[in-house]
Amino acid sequence: MATASALSSLSSLSLHTRTSSLISSSSTKSIVSFSSFLNRRFSSLTLVKASSTDTETIFFEDETPEITANVVFDPPIAPEGFVSPPYFDEGSDETEEEIATAFEELYGPAYSGESMLGKDIYVMDSKHKKSSGIGGKPKKDKIRDGFEERVVQVRRVTKVVKGGKQLKFRAIVVVGDKQGNVGVGCAKAKEVVAAVQKSAIDARRNIVQVPMTKYSTFPHRSEGDYGAAKVMLRPASPGTGVIAGGAVRIVLEMAGVENALGKQLGSNNALNNARATLAAVQQMRQFRDVAQERGIPMEELWK
């Protein structure tokens, strides 16, 4: 039989051991006696092949056997205050923004799936992504002091040094509250956005008050110059509008002037014309101020 042959091979292996083996003679005798015992034990056993008639297969007509068909499922009563969990196919009551905020508080900003210059971009949602820009620094909040900003000019300038040329951007910005206060600023930076921001700060440091009448025009004529630029300003009747061009028009509109005439002479330089406009405005005076200096009432000012 197969079992007897396997045991006989085992006994033969145990008997033909090498002389260099570390096994003692007593252990060898015990192995031989054990193998002979197995031969006598299993030599009397005979293997019988099972036939197909010896097996029986039972098929249930009903999917539920009789044992469990009559059993009624009776779950225990839920305790007081128990809230059943939602089903897997039911949506959450939280909004996407609440889920995103909770995720950000626990795990920090999520990976947007985009990379720039070999660096992963971590952003929470589309709103934050638009405000910060992909791969860029987050935008700074604008200064809310009632002043509006208008860019007059942005130019690229270079500075020649020993090592080569240094490229920068120069921006001219006019700020005003359209209530008689206006300022002109100029600054340079390596980026356009930084140059505009620095120019706006410089313009806020040089605020000038523009005297106006109740018709939103100048009280009288005035002229101003800055370098080679010369600007003439004239009052206008209601409904005329601002008739001027270039930097002069921007300065007058940001100051809140609605009816005025302006003319720039001598130079087309935007910065010099803007500063010449401020110089002309600073020479204007209100009628009541002149009457107060002279010590007379305003009715006698034109006598």
Curated annotation (Swiss-Prot):
Biological process per Gene Ontology, one example term: adaxial/abaxial pattern specification
UniProt GO cellular component terms: chloroplast; chloroplast stroma; chloroplast thylakoid; chloroplast thylakoid membrane; endoplasmic reticulum; nucleus; small ribosomal subunit; thylakoid
Keyword check for Ribonucleoprotein: yes
GO MF terms held by the record: mRNA binding; rRNA binding; structural constituent of ribosome
Keyword Transit peptide annotated: yes
Keywords of the record: Chloroplast, Plastid, Ribonucleoprotein, Ribosomal protein, RNA-binding, rRNA-binding, Transit peptide
Top-level taxonomic group: Eukaryota
Subcellular localization: Plastid, Chloroplast
Domain S5 DRBM span(s) in chain numbering: 147-210
Function field: Binds directly to 16S ribosomal RNA.
Record's subunit section: Part of the 30S ribosomal subunit.
The family this protein is said to belong to: Belongs to the universal ribosomal protein uS5 family.
NCBIfam families referenced in this protein's UniProt entry, alphabetically: rpsE_bact (TIGR01021)
Protein's name according to its UniProt entry: Small ribosomal subunit protein uS5c
Organism: Arabidopsis thaliana (Mouse-ear cress)
